[in-house]
Amino acid sequence: MIDSRHSRSLRSIILALLVPCVAFHVLAQQNEDEGGNDVQGNIDGVQIHRILPSDTDPRIRNYNGDGWFHWAFRSPGVADKGKLVVFLPGTNGKGKPPAAFSKMAAKEGFSVLGLAYPSLVSISTLDKSPDQSAFAKARNNIINAETPFGRFRTEQPDCIRSRLHHLIHFLAEHQPGEGWDQYLLPNGAIDWSRLILVGQSQGGGHALFMAMEHPVERVLMFGAPKDFSKFHHQPAAWYHRPSATPLNRLFSYVHRQDRQGCTYPEQLENYRAVGLLPQYTIVNADESQPPYGGTRLFTATKPFQKSKDAHCYPLFNEVNIPVWKYMLETPID
C-alpha cells in the first residue's frame, strides 16, 4: 500500500504526463520532502516507480533531481512478454515517458523504462555544420560519452548507455520480484536482444543510432529520425552506416506538417538514406486500420497550425493507440 500523500502525488504526475508534449517541458510539482526516494504505487493496474538517477549510480551529479528522474512502469497482473521498452525523450525531456503510451505498453505485458539523460542541447543545432560527421559525433557523445564535440561534453556516468545499465541493475536489485534481471546477461551486460528502443524527436534519433550499434528487438521513432544537413542539403552521413538491427525492425511515425529539424520532403530523404524507402509504403494513420499492410512507416494529416503540435501528435494523442500497439507487437519475420 502507498499512503495518501504518495497516491495524490502519483495522480498529479499521471495528469501532467497526459498533457501533449508539455511533459517534455513542464513537470508536475513534487513535494520537496520526497527527496531522492522513488515514488511507488499502483495506478489503474500499472506499477510505477520514480527513481533518482544518483540512487542507481553514486557518480551521477548532473541531470539528477529537480525534475530529472528515471521512470519504470509494469503491470503485475499481466503475462510478462519478456521485452523491455526503453523510452528516450526529446530535447529538454527529463526522463518521463508519455503516460498513455507507457500504461498501454505495460498493460500489454511489456516492462517500460523512461530514461533521464543529457537532452538540453538540440541535435538540430548542428544542421548548418560543414562537418558531415557532426550529427554522429554529438549522438555518440550523448550515448557513449565518446567524441566530445562542441557543446556536447557528456561525462561517462551521464551517458545513455551507462545510465540504462545502472538503472536496470538498480531495479533488479531493489525490485527482485518484478523480473528486471531478465534484461541482463549472465555477465551483467544489457541483453539488447530483449530491448525495444522508443524515442521522440532527439530521442528517436538516439534510438536508431543505438540500434545500429546493438541488435535490438525493434525501434519505434516518433517525430524522428530528423538529422538533415542544411549545409550539405542531404541526410546525416551516419544513416548509411551498417546496422546491427535489421531494417524490418525499424518503425517511424512523422506527421506531414512536422517541420521540426527538417521538412517533410527532407524527412523522406532521411527514410531513403536509412533504407526504409522505397522498401516500405508510408501509411496515413488517420485514414487506415491495422494491420496497415505490414508497413514500418506512418504519417498523419490531421491539420495543425503549429509544427510543434504536429511533431507531438504521433506519440501524445491516444487516437494513435492502434498504431502504437501495431508498432510494438506486429510479428517480425
Residue ranges of predicted features:
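Gly/Ala-rich beta-loop-alpha elbow adjacent to hydrolase catalytic centers
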Residues: V198-G203, A207
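Alpha/beta-hydrolase active-site loop
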Residues: S133-N187
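Short beta-strand element of the alpha/beta-hydrolase
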Residues: G82-G90
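Short amphipathic alpha-helix adjacent to the substrate-entry channel of hydrolases
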Residues: A99-G114
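N-terminal cap/lid segment of alpha/beta-hydrolase-fold proteins
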Residues: Q30-V78
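Alpha/beta-hydrolase fold nucleophile elbow
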Residues: L185-G199
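The feature captures the conserved acid-bearing segment of alpha/beta-hydrolase catalytic domains
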Residues: A72-P76, E217-C312
